[in-house]
Swiss-Prot record:
Protein known as: DNA-directed RNA polymerase subunit beta'
Superkingdom of origin organism: Bacteria
EC assignment: 2.7.7.6
Organism this protein belongs to: Polaromonas sp. (strain JS666 / ATCC BAA-500)
Magnesium found in the keyword field: yes
GO cellular component terms given for this protein: DNA-directed RNA polymerase complex
Gene name tied to this protein: rpoC
Ligand binding (Zn(2+) 2): C813, C887, C894, C897
Length: 1408
């Protein structure tokens, strides 16, 4: 059998492997791979096209050119297999060995491997503890290195120039050895004793921070060498392997020219220089000539390995840099990304898509010709089985002739054989779905309208690809997992993906609207059949209000049977007819309203939860049919008279123009600054635009009609444009506003707003100037879109890469940890309800009823819709749930911590690749996000000019913990907290709203006061920021000197003067002084902060207007100074995609705020130039201090007590600080909330758990702090799971485990620092990753998906996970079996020797 296999050389499936190890090749290893030395640079003889002997394509070394035929033609055919021809020396075998046989070049002088030299950090430099510059000088023959100092005072490793060398030669003679080039470096490497070095370094791990870091790096490297058995001198090459010739082909073109791989050129150069050097050495040429040749050889080898890494790249004849071995594997077109991660697929086709409204959800229309081509092999086999064709060739002929029997067979073959459709770009898993093909005429693929939103497809010329799953297993997976009717929810948020859009929505909306005084209003019907007859007879309008007796089916929870109940409903004709398609178990109330797009989505969602998948799919198909039919019947059209321009528009605009004139007037007379004028003008126009659109929508949305009693009543309008927008079919209020209201303010390309608005609308038409202004925005939009797509794709790629190995690996990790979830309330509005946050998660502990403490949900229960209804009814406002971050599963996640699989609606299955799903969910809507950076201070801050806050609901007032306030002389409560919030609770004590209140606001409510909706809670001056005193006393100015720290400003108009704090360094003041106020009590002493001996000091910031005089009496809550908000610099707020990327890359924001490092009391130390020294003293007297630039806004004052992690200097928080001071949970909350803010602004819903999954991966590395008994080095970064495993092992042995701290890495860093070198190399920085891995002798355990794709195995996710587990179990059983057999044999042998007669052994002693 073996010989038979050999005969056809069919590769048997490779034996299984569980890991891949990478290392460095020793010269012996390279020689053992080689089949001979390449001595000549010749390639092929260009007349005979035969390879030259000993050349780069030599047949003797690499194998024959024709199958089973030697070069000279002496031996041909299979019978001479394995013979080596004595004439030409070629082995008679298959030609494909030319793809696998390697050669080698013996280098006349050693050459350093450029990767270990130049890939930063330089490994050679680390090992030898020399600088890269020095090593380069030695390698490229500019300096000598001492390799053996002998008895001289010279130091080993020291560098000397030519002149030094000559001088020392004269001085010491041959006492010492110094060498140049790679030989010198090689000698040094050979002279290293790893054990000695390691011991030395281990003892040296003390001293300065930098030294420790460097030593730790060296130590790690040395230990890696020792562990992997790699000798450092292998970093210098003596032998160069030569790639098999068929992998660097040379192809003759017609006309006597050749197309060749660049590698051949590079190899030729190496061989040429090498043989020249060999000749020079044999001739004993002068040192300087040989040296030059050696340098050139080193450069040639460098170029071959990595061209352009050092110096100028070698170029071919056409001035193009040659593609070296390194270029072959890196980058988008390198081996990893081009061939291993992205392969071309056979059995696939592509075509344009069109609409297939008659298809069922799980079907697609496949053009006959395409199907014939794709299913050819199946047809061939059927033809043979039926005996119509005897050979494949005959079958082929039969198919090509296109006889009727072929089409019959095609129908048969295609039946129940799903195909997969894919639309590029495939941004999430719904971008590939399986369908059952239906054969159609024509050449376009027909697609079901409802799956368009999942594919993001439209029919304006989109193309889609078809793939055929061939094996039975593949067909089974396609059918069960990928069939379109099994994927009706978005994995990103669990909402239905098969929601109708556009005309279907319009049809359903029109049908379910009600009209006053429609034909047949007030009729009563006994069932829907009667309604249909009346409608068909023309006696009934769809929109007429009628009464119908309808039967509803409710499901009995115990038995699962449907029980009918009948009652009379007041409804409309259209709704009654629509009720015929409702599935059993879905109440009529769900469609007894005007169905807008959102409502239809809800309807399908409810149907899925209540009636299950199958019913829902059927229902969706019926909805689609009804929608199309009714939209056609409704005959909604659009005409210019539908665009009603409001009469009030003219007045609003002229009023705005008048206001703008007034402001211009004020500006001219110097009352307002240029910036204020611009802001106010933009503000006026913004408000007016909104007003016009409000008036317009009010006019569009209502119409007056006569009811059947002859009275005039208002009803919702049947205006076509309004209906399209209102139903969600097409268009929006903003677009209607441009058509029929006014276009409003336009932005310049840089994002700033042009202050003259476009007052016209499209109905009236724009004039030239207005048209010109509006082209600005349109062009910016187009340019943005192109950029956005690329950036969004790159973000998705980085996200996928960081989470690609995260798979659900077990049911339950048994953790008791979790996160406390409550509704997110901002500015009084519930942005995300508790329901949305906990739906589909697992409770950590029992959820109790707030009043009677009964258990509502048990610990470990999945919180589904029904349970959450109960929780909401009971008034639970916070629940502790399990999250991906707190999951304790090693190398994966557990199903309980992840919770519901949003795409399928049940608990997540083991083997689901939740990481990839999370990355796709976040990346897919990326193209919808903006690329914009908002300029705050322009009109974008319009929203910020709020001056009061009012309650939205009735309830009881409460304040949050940081809220502090004082009562001033007028009895008003003045807020002195920086992060105070007013909370409103309902009668159950549930939080209803939460409002932030700025520092210096006046509260108009007290704690525990009951208020009604609409009550004002607090108000403040939005244009200035006050500086307030908390204590009473007499004002004592310090350092308030006119002309030094303050300047007198006289107002031109009013003639009043105020003091303005100026930056003292501008006025040539020698020492930096800070103007401030102290308070003096009645006895003349300084007022102290209660409980401390700090005096009350209140500092003034630059730009503050001082409001009090020296010696004035002030009470608590009084304003000492005001800072005009206009004086604040406009700061850019990063929005959209760049913000999301910034968060996931964990970048430190520019102008970041400072958080308190510890809990304690604030004080200010001695100032330095331009900086304030801020100190915090904790209760034990430990002091932490920070220098804060003067222009920063400091949020605390002398003597204030702050908590660890509280914000003390204004600015965006740094995620690293949050992790360090507040811990992982707080960090996760911060990233989740910030990312959600960006998506929410665009109206995109993403479930929190996807972001948590990414954050888990960003936190997957830890830093070793205390080594304990582990083999780690302090400061080393380790995979968290590996660390925990190692610690468990140490504890089991009773040793001291290592301690570690959390490390937050950005997604790019995290991807590159993964333990899998294959995955990291295929992501970015291929050279660096591979160099490091080779030196460390790394093993890749092939845990992630990417590694497995690259090595060509099934991925360990989904069905592949079960396969790998079964395989491993079988291997274990086989091992055990082998062991058992061996043991049995040994036992038998032993028994045999024991029972053998004693004399048989000759002189063996008798057994006693």
């Amino acid at each position: 059998m073996k010989s038979l296999l050999d005969l056809f050389k069919q590769f048997t499936p490779d034996e299984h492997f569980d890991a891949i190890k990478i290392g460095m090749a020793s010269p012996e290893k390279i020689r053992s791979w080689s089949f001979g030395e390449v001595k000549k640079p010749e390639t092929i003889n260009y007349r005979t096209f035969k390879p030259e002997r000993d050349g780069l394509f030599c047949a003797k070394i690499f194998g024959p050119i024709k199958d089973y035929e030697c070069l000279c033609g002496k031996y041909k055919r299979l019978k001479h297999r394995g013979v080596i021809c004595e004439k030409c020396g070629v082995e008679v075998t298959q030609t494909k060995v030319r793809r696998e046989r390697m050669g080698h070049i013996d280098l006349a002088a050693p050459c350093a491997h450029i990767w270990f030299l130049k890939s930063l950090p330089s490994r050679l430099g680390l090992v030898l503890d020399m600088t890269l510059r020095d090593i380069e000088r030695v390698l490229y023959f500019e300096a000598y290195v001492v390799t053996d100092p002998g008895m001289t005072p010279l130091k080993k490793f020291s560098i000397m120039s030519e002149d030094d060398y000559d001088a020392k030669r004269k001085e010491y003679g041959d006492e010492y050895v110094a060498k140049m080039g790679a030989e010198g470096i090689k000698d040094l490497l050979e002279g290293l004793d790893l054990d000695v070095e390691i011991d030395k370094l281990r003892n040296d791990l003390t001293g300065s921070e930098i030294k420790i870091k460097k030593n730790a790096k060296r130590l790690k490297l040395m230990e890696a060498f020792k562990k992997s058995g790699i000798k450092p001198e292998w970093m210098v090459l003596d032998v160069l392997p030569v790639l098999p010739p068929d992998l660097r082909p040379l192809v003759p073109l017609d006309g006597g020219r050749f197309a060749t791989s660049d590698l051949n050129d590079l190899y030729r150069r190496v061989i040429n220089r090498n043989s020249r050097l060999r000749r020079l050495l044999e001739l004993k040429a002068p040192e300087i000539i040989a040296r030059n040749e050696k340098r050139m050889l080193q450069e040639a080898v460098d170029s071959l390995l990595d061209n352009g890494r050092r110096g100028k790249a070698m170029t071919g004849a056409n001035k193009r840099a040659l593609k070296s071995l390194a270029d072959m594997i890196k980058g988008k077109s390198g081996r990893f990304r081009q061939n291993l991660l992205g392969k071309r697929v056979d059995y696939s086709g592509r075509s344009v898509i069109t609409m297939g409204p008659t298809l069922k959800l799980h079907q697609c229309g496949l053009p006959k010709l395409m199907a014939l081509e794709l299913f050819k092999p199946f047809i061939f086999s059927r033809l043979e089985a039926m005996g119509i064709a005897t050979t494949i060739k005959a079958a082929k002929k039969e198919v090509e002739s296109g006889t009727p029997v072929v089409w019959d067979i095609l129908e048969e073959v295609i039946k129940e054989h799903p195909v997969m459709l894919n639309r590029a770009p495939t941004l999430h898993r719904l971008g590939i779905q399986a369908f059952e093909p239906i054969l159609i005429e024509g050449k376009a693929i027909q697609l079901h309208p409802l799956v368009c939103s999942a594919f993001n497809a439209d029919f304006d010329g989109d193309q889609m690809a078809v793939h055929v799953p061939l094996s039975v297993e593949a067909q089974m997976e396609a059918r069960t997992l990928m069939l379109a009717s099994n994927n009706i929810l978005f994995p990103a948020n669990g909402e239905p993906s098969i929601v109708p859009s556009q005309d279907v929505v319009l049809g359903l909306y029109y049908t379910t609207r009600d009209r006053t005084n429609g034909k047949g209003e007030g009729l009563v019907f006994s069932d829907t059949g009667e309604v249909r007859r009346a409608f068909d007879a023309g006696e009934l309008d769809l929109n007429a209000r009628i009464s119908v007796r309808l039967t509803e089916w409710t499901k009995n929870k115990e038995t699962g049977e449907f029980i009918p109940s009948t009652k009379l409903w007041e409804t409309t004709g259209g709704r009654a007819l629509l009720s015929e398609i409702l599935p059993k178990g879905l109440p009529f109330s769900n469609i007894n309203k005007a169905l807008k797009k959102k409502e239809i989505s809800k309807l399908i969602n409810v149907s899925f939860r209540k009636c299950g998948l199958k019913e829902t799919v059927v229902f969706a198909d019926k909805l689609l049919q009804s929608g199309f039919r009714l939209a056609t019947k409704a005959g909604i059209s659009i005409c210019i008279d539908d665009m009603l321009v409001p009469k009030e528009k003219h007045d609003i605009i002229s009023r705005a123009q008048k206001e703008v004139k007034e402001i211009e007037q004020q500006y001219v007379s110097g009352l307002v600054t240029s910036g204020e004028r611009y802001n106010k003008v933009v503000d006026i126009w913004g408000k007016s635009g909104d007003e016009v659109s409000k008036v317009m929508m009010a006019q569009l949305s209502k119409e007056k009609v006569i009811d059947r009693h002859g009275k005039e009543v208002e009803q919702e309008s049947f205006n076509s444009i309004y209906m399209m927008a209102d139903s969600g079919a097409r268009g929006s209020a903003a677009q209607i506003r441009q058509v029929a209201g006014m276009r409003g303010l336009m932005a310049k390309p840089d994002g700033s707003i042009i202050e003259t608005p476009i007052t016209a609308n499209f109905r009236e038409g724009l004039n030239v100037l207005e048209y010109f202004i509006s082209t600005h925005g349109a062009r910016k939009g187009l340019a943005d879109t192109a950029l956005k797509t690329a950036n969004s794709g790159y973000l998705t790629r980085r996200l996928c890469d960081v989470v690609q190995d995260l798979v659900v690996t077990e049911d339950d990790c048994g953790t008791q940890e979790g996160s406390l979830m409550r509704a997110i309330v901002e500015g009084g509005e519930v942005i995300e309800s508790l329901r949305e946050r906990i739906l589909g998660r697992t409770a950590v502990e029992d959820v109790l009823h707030p009043e009677n403490r009964s258990v509502l949900a048990k610990a470990g229960a999945m919180l589904d819709e029904d349970l959450i209804d109960e929780l909401e009814a009971a008034g639970v406002d916070e629940v502790k749930v399990r999250t991906a971050l707190t999951c304790e599963t090693r190398f994966g996640l557990c199903a309980k911590c992840y919770g519901r699989d949003l795409g399928r609606g049940g608990l997540i299955n083991i083997g689901e690749a939740v990481g990839i799903i999370a990355a796709q969910s976040i990346g897919e809507p990326g193209t919808q996000l903006t690329m914009r950076t908002f300029h705050i201070g322009g009109a974008a801050s319009r929203a910020a000019i709020a001056s009061s806050v009012e309650a939205k609901s009735n309830g009881v007032i409460g304040f949050n913990a940081p809220m502090r306030y004082v009562t001033n002389g007028k009895g008003e409560l003045v807020v002195i907290a920086r992060s105070g919030e007013i909370v409103i609770h309902d009668e159950h004590g549930r939080e209803r709203e939460r409002h932030k209140v700025p520092y210096g606001a006046t509260l108009t409510v007290k704690a525990d006061q009951t208020i009604k909706a609409g009550a004002i809670l607090a108000n403040w001056d939005p244009l200035t920021r006050p500086i307030i005193t908390e204590f009473a006393g007499k004002v004592l100015f310090e350092n308030v000197e006119e002309g030094v720290t303050v300047a007198k400003q006289v107002d031109d108009v009013t003639g009043l003067s105020t003091l303005v704090v100026i930056d003292p360094k501008r006025r040539g003041a020698t020492k930096v002084i800070r103007p401030q106020v102290k308070l003096i009590d009645a006895t003349g002493n300084e007022v102290k902060i209660p409980g401390t001996d700090h005096s009350v000091t209140i500092g003034f910031q630059v730009g503050a207007l001082v409001q009090v005089r020296d010696g004035q009496d002030v009470g608590p809550g009084e304003v000492l100074a005001r800072i005009p908000v206009e004086g604040q610099k406009t700061r850019d707020i990063t929005g959209g995609l760049p913000r999301v990327a910034e968060l996931f890359e964990a970048r430190t924001p520019k102008d970041k705020g400072t958080l308190a490092e510890m809990t304690g009391t604030v004080s200010f130390g001695k100032e330095t130039k331009g900086k304030v020294r801020l100190q915090i003293t904790d209760p034990d007297g430990k002091v932490w201090e920070d220098l804060v630039p003067k222009e920063k806004n400091i949020l605390v004052h002398e003597g204030q007590v702050v908590n660890k992690g509280e914000s003390i200097v204004d600015g965006p928080a740094d995620p690293q600080d949050i992790l360090r001071l507040l811990g992982m949970e707080e960090l996760a909350r911060y990233i989740v909330d910030e990312v959600q803010d960006v998506y929410r602004l665009q109206g995109v819903k993403i479930n929190d758990k996807h972001i948590e999954v990414i954050v888990r991966q960003m936190l997957r590395r830890v830093v070793v702090e205390n080594v304990g008994d582990s083999s780690y080095i302090a400061g080393e970064q380790v995979e968290r799971s590996a660390m925990l495993d190692a610690n468990d092992a140490l504890r089991a042995e009773g040793k001291i485990p290592a301690t570690f701290s959390n490390l937050l890495l950005g997604i790019t860093k995290a991807s590159l620092s993964t333990d899998s070198f294959i995955s990291a190399a295929s992501f970015q920085e291929t050279t660096r990753v591979l160099t490091e891995a080779a030196i460390m002798g790394k093993r890749d355990e092939l845990r992630g998906l990417k590694e497995n794709v690259i090595v060509g195995r099934l991925i360990p996710a989904g069905t592949g996970m079960a396969y790998h587990e079964a395989r491993k179990a079988k291997d274990l059983m086989d091992d055990a079996e082998r062991r058992a057999i061996a043991e049995a044999e040994a036992a038998e042998l032993e028994a045999a020797t024991a029972t053998a007669p004693a004399d048989a052994g000759g002189d063996s002693p008798a057994t006693e």
